[in-house]
């Protein structure tokens, strides 16, 4: 089946795939190597992408859903966008800068393998929440198994990124 995949930078990928094939495998076969292989069960976060601005494990998304799952943009146009980690880094958005600053402040290292899960879950949390508790972050990262960062440090880094993004620099001391 011909499936058109729309990527964030308005580049499209036309592929001949079974609609049930995982988005992870289709993207990797087409050169998107920032999508890593991992548990293949949607738990580890290594294959995380942004689909319509939300973090999703690409191993659990059938590529056929990217064709039919649409949302309306601010200008009323229907769009489906997929953002890989490489695309996200190139965009250098305010969210990305805040995440990197929060991670840096908390001593989070980025090994290159599990980065997508950490960064995209942080993005989803800071972008779509007006407030964020430690429990919310713990719940969001509970299934991640980062090979280079312990869970407590990751939670602190995401909370710090949230503070920076929302201009709540002073709340760092309130958490402790």
What are these regions (language model features)?
Residues 1-176:
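Signature of N-terminal electron-transfer/Fe-S-associated modules in redox systems
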């Amino acid at each position: 089946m011909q499936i058109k995949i729309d990527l964030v930078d308005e580049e499209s990928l036309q592929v001949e795939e079974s609609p049930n094939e995982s988005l992870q495998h289709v993207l990797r076969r087409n050169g998107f190597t920032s999508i890593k292989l991992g548990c293949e069960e949607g738990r580890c976060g290594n294959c995380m992408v942004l689909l319509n601005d939300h973090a999703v494990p690409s191993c659990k998304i059938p590529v056929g859903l990217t064709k039919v799952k649409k949302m309306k943009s601010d200008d009323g146009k229907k769009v489906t966008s997929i953002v890989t980690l490489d695309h996200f880094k190139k965009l250098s958005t305010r969210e990305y800068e805040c995440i990197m600053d929060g991670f840096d402040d908390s001593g989070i290292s980025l090994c290159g393998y599990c980065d997508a899960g950490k960064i995209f879950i942080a993005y989803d949390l800071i972008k779509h929440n007006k407030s964020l508790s430690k429990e919310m972050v713990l719940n969001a990262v509970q299934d991640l198994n980062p090979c280079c960062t312990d869970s407590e440090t990751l939670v602190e880094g995401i909370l710090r990124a949230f503070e920076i993004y929302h201009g709540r620099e002073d709340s760092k001391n309130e958490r402790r």
